[in-house]
Structure formats: C-alpha cells, structure tokens
UniProtKB/Swiss-Prot annotation:
Record key words, sorted: Secreted
Protein name, UniProt field: ESAT-6-like protein EsxK
Entry's induction text: Differentially expressed under different growth conditions. Highly expressed in sputum bacteria.
Family of the protein in this entry: Belongs to the WXG100 family. CFP-10 subfamily.
Coiled coil region boundaries: none
Record bears the keyword Secreted: yes
Highest rank taxon of the organism: Bacteria
Length: 98
C-alpha cells in the first residue's frame, strides 16, 4: 500500500479542526458518563460495591482524558506541520526567485 503524505497546509488545518471536534465529543461524553456515575453513586450502592464502581469510573475517565490528550496532540502536530510546511515553501520560493 502506497503512503500518501498530506502537503496541503489548508487541508492539514482542516483535519486538525476535525481532531478538535472529536476531542470535544469524547470530552463531553466522558463528562456525561462521570456525572451519571456520580448520580448513581449512593442510590442503593454502598461500601465496597460503591467504591469499586467509582474506582472503575475514575479509571475510565482517565482513559478518556488520555484519548483527548492524544487527539489534541495530533491536532497540534498538524497545525505545527502546516505552519512549517508553509514557511519552508516560502523560503524555497524566495531562493528560487533570487
């Protein structure tokens, strides 16, 4: 399978925007999940069962946070690379025109 490299800075920034939307969606859903877990806690749960449930939810919340951080990392990398590509392209054009 041939690799395709994205070299259009505008497309790279558009793709970065998509990663931001995905990150926001994951973050929103994780927040709702955590709120739901907090609402359930104490409603018939007690002792070890409640503690285990909250611990599991905390671990899942951290996993979602890690996903959000990775999505933000990809977003930031795309924006950075788009900026670098444009700068290098401009420098190359200046060299060729002189």
């Amino acid at each position: 399978m041939a690799s395709r490299f994205m070299t259009d800075p505008h497309a790279m920034r558009d793709m970065a925007g998509r990663f931001e939307v995905h990150a926001q969606t994951v973050e929103d859903e994780a927040r709702r999940m955590w709120a739901s877990a907090q609402n359930i806690s104490g409603a018939g749960w007690s002792g070890m069962a409640e503690a285990t449930s909250l611990d599991t939810m905390a671990q899942m919340n951290q996993a979602f946070r890690n996903i959000v951080n990775m999505l933000h990392g990809v977003r930031d990398g795309l924006v950075r690379d788009a900026n670098n590509y444009e700068q290098q392209e401009q420098a190359s054009q200046q060299i060729l025109s002189s």
